[in-house]
């Protein structure tokens, strides 16, 4: 907790008006005569309520890979959104995209993100144990920042190279206002500075 406190930068974001788009997906299925009737949707919605992308798939299969299909559709929605918004917010973690997706999908995602460098991954939960493992930490990183801080701000930038040099994940834990729950913000690439994350916090403050 002491280490987490020393890694924390106090920062109160100032709202900056940008055209942001949020992307999320959902899926559902029900058993039907020995098969599964399923549906998957992915949407991209701008902060003013305009729907940029609305994708739907459905079918009848014996063993549909719905989570993978939902992820693919999120990437499709992201591809269609990067040119139409200043900032594209992906719900969830970049780790899960790289860990559970096939190589072609990961490559497609990397190409989409690097096109405009305006894609940000935001998650409300995190199981990563990267920052304090050399201190014998047993809980996830987010646990220590939650206990060490209540002020708005963000943690020291952490760069993870486990997926290779073209898939480096840079992340911080952040709090937008005092006593709010932490969120995790992930960007693709390396070499980011504190100011880069301050700009993002200003843009996502609503």
Regions found by a protein language model. Give the residues of each.
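Short hydrophobic beta-strand that contains or immediately precedes a catalytic carboxylate
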Residues: 20-23
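Long, contiguous domain-sized segments
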Residues: 1-13, 18, 50, 66-206
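Acidic, metal-ligating active-site segments
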Residues: 25-63
